[in-house]
Amino acid sequence: MFAVIKTGGKQYRVVANQVVRVEKIIGNAGDVVEFNDILMAGQEDNAIIGAPVVRDALVTAEIIEQARARKVIAFKKRRRQNSKRTRGHRQEVTTLRILEILTGGLKPKKAVAKSIKEEAAVLKATTQETKSAASVKKAAKKSAPQKQAAVASNSKED
């Protein structure tokens, strides 16, 4: 059985026990994630095509590692100007092992932690809580009281 999943703005054709590298997914090595955006699923001769997604379809995968892809070099040179610029970029990627592909509303065999969208929502909520806790500032202190000697010297002038 195969499935076409959508993650990170890309589409991947996956089968059970396949290892695939996708855009970064939140989670640690060993975590189990599930994909709900299944565009197509089925056998070679009998496929279900979603409009836009297949109902009651689920793909579970295990995170093998979080890594960074090879460096991509962006080099610009302006001729006769003695000007050039070199920049590098390394994309963060996640290596996954596809555990099972389920259709027809079947439940996964292994206990699945959370779906990717739920994890992202939880992460966003926790970051907002920490930002709000960090943004609470104490009021500035009033100016320091005058020293006794300065007050005494002012009263002598009178």
Swiss-Prot record:
Q: Which family does it belong to?
A: Belongs to the bacterial ribosomal protein bL21 family.
State the encoding gene.
rplU
Gene Ontology terms describing biological process: translation
Q: Does the keyword Ribonucleoprotein apply?
A: yes
Give the UniProt entry's GO cellular component terms: cytoplasm; ribonucleoprotein complex; ribosome
What positions belong to coiled-coil segments?
Answer: none
Protein name as annotated: Large ribosomal subunit protein bL21
Give the source's domain of life in one word.
Bacteria
